Amino acid sequence: MAFLSSGAYLTHQQKVLRLYKRALRHLESWCIHRDKYRYFACLLRARFDEHKNEKDMVKATQLLREAEEEFWHGQHPQPYIFPESPGGTSYERYECYKVPEWCLDDWHPSEKAMYPDYFAKREQWKKLRRESWEREVKQLQEETPVGGPRTEALPPARKQGDLPPLWWHIVTRPRERPM
């Protein structure tokens, strides 16, 4: 569990904010009626606000530890998990339906006419990609030593205003869900 070790690097404020958010999410699971939830959320916020200006870090750390223990004992046994979140029922469900970018090249002109702004911008990206391809490959060949490591990250742009090599897959994404 690598995410647990990152807690040592969080500031006190970040730990308090994360505890507050977790407490609100679990409170949402306990109180299904919105008005009741809002009332208890205001009470919870008031409890956190009581000690928000605490200057003594020893006391603040002790308060945080006590609050985390209270949260642990009062958490919901089956908290609500959003469907698209990790652990949710629909998490990564539509991965197999994502359409690759090259499939848009095969659209009929009448289909492309329905989204003129998108396809105009896409054509600009494709033109820029064609123009920069040779220069980017040349830059990579010059900067990569023969027999050198092939798993390192790509080098950054060397000139002001230039893009790093092979950049377009970062700035252009395929449609995430089919229509």
From Swiss-Prot:
GO cellular component entries: mitochondrial inner membrane; mitochondrion; respiratory chain complex I
Query: Where are the Phosphoserine modifications?
Result: 85
N-acetylalanine occurs at 2
Subcellular location as annotated: Mitochondrion inner membrane
Keyword list (alphabetical) reads:
Acetylation, Electron transport, Membrane, Mitochondrion, Mitochondrion inner membrane, Phosphoprotein, Respiratory chain, Transport
Q: Which membrane topology describes this protein? A: Peripheral membrane protein
Tell me the protein family, please: Belongs to the complex I LYR family.
Assembly behavior: Mammalian complex I is composed of 45 different subunits.
Write out the function statement from the record. Answer: Accessory subunit of the mitochondrial membrane respiratory chain NADH dehydrogenase (Complex I), that is believed to be not involved in catalysis. Complex I functions in the transfer of electrons from NADH to the respiratory chain. The immediate electron acceptor for the enzyme is believed to be ubiquinone.
User: What name appears for this protein in its UniProt entry?
Assistant: NADH dehydrogenase [ubiquinone] 1 beta subcomplex subunit 9
Species of the source: Bos taurus
